[in-house]
């Protein structure tokens, strides 16, 4: 199964646990494939660094290494312009170009779309309840 993980799900999984962490663990263990572009990976790294700085450095940026290593990095070719927050179009483009079936997000600007072509947009809880054994 191929998915795209929105940055807020990644942050929740890394720093807070719960359903987002179950998804990240499933990617790291190879149970599913998470796809990203270089732009998305850069955003992951920048936001994690911001969180580390806020927590005064008690967590190493290396916490992302297992996930980044497990990601399938793709080169986007499709331009998508349907999200009310233009910065989120990169997740739709990545999902389309990687032939992912799901975007896992907590972002209302993405969740309101619900489905883009054959790609479902689900919360981490919805995704876990439907596709991961809890």
Located regions from the model:
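Metal-dependent nucleic-acid phosphoesterase active-site entry motif
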Residues: 1-18
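PIN/NYN-family metal-dependent endoribonuclease catalytic core
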Residues: 5, 21-49
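A secondary-structure boundary/capping signal
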Residues: 6-7, 36-37, 106-107, 123
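Short, flexible loop segments at the rims of nucleotide/cofactor-binding pockets, characterized by
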Residues: 11-13, 53, 78-84
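Residues at secondary-structure transition points
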Residues: 18, 35, 58, 82-89
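Short active-site oxyanion
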Residues: 31-34, 99-101, 119
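Active-site neighborhoods of divalent-metal-dependent phosphate/nucleic-acid chemistry enzymes
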Residues: 69-102, 108
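Acidic, PIN/NYN-like endoribonuclease modules and their adjacent C-terminal/linker elements
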Residues: 98, 108-134
């Amino acid at each position: 199964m191929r998915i795209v993980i929105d940055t807020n799900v990644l942050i929740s999984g890394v720093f807070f646990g719960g359903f987002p962490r179950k998804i990240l663990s499933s990617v790291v263990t190879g149970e599913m494939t998470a796809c990203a572009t270089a732009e998305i990976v850069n955003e992951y790294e920048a936001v994690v660094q911001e969180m580390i700085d806020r927590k005064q450095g008690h967590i190493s940026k290396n916490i992302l290494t297992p996930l980044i290593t497990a990601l399938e990095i793709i080169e986007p070719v499709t331009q998508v312009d349907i999200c009310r927050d233009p910065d989120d179009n990169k997740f739709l483009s990545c999902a389309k170009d990687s032939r992912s079936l799901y975007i896992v997000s907590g972002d209302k600007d993405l969740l309101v779309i619900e489905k883009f072509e054959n790609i479902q947009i689900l919360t981490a809880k919805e995704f876990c309840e439907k596709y991961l054994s809890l």
